[in-house]
Amino acid sequence: MNYLKELIYRIRGEYTTEKLIKMGMRVGENFTRLNDVILDPAHCWLIEIGNNVTMAPRVHVLCHDASTKQFIGYTKIGGVKVGNNVFVGADTVILPSVTIGNNVIIGAHSTVTHDITDNSVVVGSPAKIICSLDEYLGKEKKRMKNSKCYGCLLYTSPSPRDRSV
């Protein structure tokens, strides 16, 4: 089955997480890579992903930026480091030379152009901090508890973040 999966990925020009790890990418435990996530295959050895990281559909992690090549003859290349306990929303682009701290939520359709500090929630293009993780989680717990939304569950078991405190 793994051979068939690998063959399909190769035909489509995509790489499995396992293949990228063999090519030098570093990944911690509990990494969830949803559909159509692109992890720069040409520079995957510059990507480091921590524990408990989720990348929603169509996230792009790029370690190169060729926007300057036509004008000055050089391509910018830089590593991307994603900390522990990070959620990256759908259609987000993470550009080269960026470090994302621990305990971070990145909203959908964001463009991460600079480092993100620990315990932050960021959104936008370019991504900007909108609040601390604790503020966001407090608001969301209250909202979910008081709303009648289908599929909203308030988990009472501690998250990996809570267990480390």
Residue ranges and their predicted role:
Residues 68-74:
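Flexible, solvent-exposed loop segments that connect beta-strands
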Residues 1-39:
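Extended, small-residue-rich solenoid/repeat segments and analogous flexible loops
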